[in-house]
Regions:
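Short, conserved catalytic-motif segment at the N-terminal edge
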Residues: 3-63, 83-85, 101-108, 392
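Short, surface-exposed loop or secondary-structure junction motifs
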Residues: 101-341
């Protein structure tokens, strides 16, 4: 057997994951671990409650926020083309974000603002420090009420999909003041939607087309996109929301993903398979793998957060690191911080559909898990913690 994992460890990993399906945590899942050239895939359960057919390795899942690093890679490709740079003001392509004003404090009325001290840059957007993002207690703030009235959704995955087009969405954001001065504070999520629209404006083509031609086709990601074609809908898993009475169906195979969305959302709109995700993660692990340059990968994995960002957003970062460009990254101190074997380590991210991916350069372990159960918190679920604990224990 290859040296990446122990046979007993992989058996224990399979038992752990199938156990969560057996107890009803999720209807089904597909997980992959890879180390030292050895790949092991676990499939368990079915694609929907009440479906007696076993889930296949080619099952299609809503990957939610695992979309973010993929869109980040597309931006880096455009940077390599010379079409834009990290230090460029985004208003060159997104004039809706020019001349920003900033709330004096988060609970201020919308007209209680001051001028932005500088323009928003491409790096600000990709590092989630452009001045706007998820408000964790939205009911308390006038700006959150205005956001909801416009139809923007910055908390959680983009479900149900917005009826707004990319142009309408960015125009709506442009009508709101920023929450912080550009470049001063990390706020989750919204930067990824902006990044997707930025790709469209810079490339002069729809985001779905840019991703297909620049990322998916070169990497052989044949089942990844913003909707599922008719001939593949039978492979799309159903999505469930956990509650006191068990799992409630949120979206089925012929629901939101049966047709292209009005807004291809860079924050969480993609569907994919375990093998497509492995192709993307392997590209990054190979320092770009011939798609991205080594320098682009280095820039994506460079932590941009401050200690204040880490403290304020501990629910996102845990004790493991910070944020690079469109994904979580390990920090120098991360190795001495963690005591929980289930904490995701390395670079990657997690999704609101229960998905998780990390590549840990320290151990060479890559793990990916795709599920169909919506998260109830930004913190890792019990299933996610158990997956990472078992995956690490399986390493030889």
């Amino acid at each position: 057997m290859a040296a990446g994992f122990t046979r007993a460890g992989l058996a224990a990993l399979d038992e752990t994951l199938t156990g969560h399906v057996a107890t009803g945590t999720v209807p089904g899942l597909v997980a992959l671990v890879e180390r030292d050239g050895e790949v092991h895939v676990t499939t368990a359960g079915s694609k929907a409650l009440g479906d007696s057919k076993a889930l296949g390795r080619d099952a299609i899942f809503r990957i939610a926020s695992l979309t973010k690093p993929i869109v980040g890679a597309a931006v880096m490709l455009l940077i390599e083309d010379g079409a834009l740079g990290l230090a460029d003001p985004v208003e060159k392509w997104l004039p809706e974000l020019a001349g920003r004003r900033v709330l004096r404090h988060l609970s201020a009325d919308l007209d209680d603002t001051m001028p932005a001290q500088r323009a928003i840059t491409v790096e600000d957007v990709l590092s989630f420090r452009f001045g706007f993002g998820t408000i964790m207690s939205p009911d308390h703030y006038p700006v959150a009420a205005a956001e909801a009235e416009i139809g923007l959704k910055t908390l959680g995955p983009p479900w149900p999909p917005t009826p707004l087009s990319p142009d309408e969405w960015i125009a709506g954001l442009g009508r709101l003041p920023l929450l912080d001065q550009p470049g001063t504070r990390w706020r989750y999520n919204t930067g990824a939607t902006v990044a997707g629209i930025l790709v469209e404006r810079v490339a002069g083509a729809p985001l779905a087309e840019v991703l297909a031609t620049r990322v998916f086709e070169p990497l052989g990601m044949t089942d990844t996109g913003f909707h599922v074609p008719e001939g593949k809908l039978h492979r799309l898993t159903s999505m469930y929301q956990p509650g006191a009475d068990g799992l409630t169906l949120v979206d089925g195979p012929r629901g939101w993903y049966a047709a292209p969305p009005a807004l291809p959302d860079g924050s969480g709109g993609l569907v994919s398979t375990i093998d497509d995700m492995e192709a993307f993660t392997a590209m990054l692990a190979a320092d770009g793998g011939g798609l991205l340059s080594t320098e682009s990968v280095r820039l994506m994995l460079l932590d941009r957060t401050t200690e204040r960002d880490k403290t304020e957003n501990a629910v996102f970062f845990g004790d493991q690191g910070g944020w690079g460009l469109m994904m979580a990254v390990p920090t120098e101190a991360a190795g001495s911080r963690s005591t929980d074997p289930g904490t995701p380590r390395g670079y990657g991210w997690d999704g609101g559909s229960g998905t998780t991916w990390r590549t840990d350069p320290a151990t060479g372990l890559t793990g990916i898990m795709l599920t169909q159960r919506m998260a109830t918190s930004p913190a890792p679920s019990a299933l996610t913690l158990d997956f990472w604990t078992a995956a690490r224990a399986a390493c030889a």
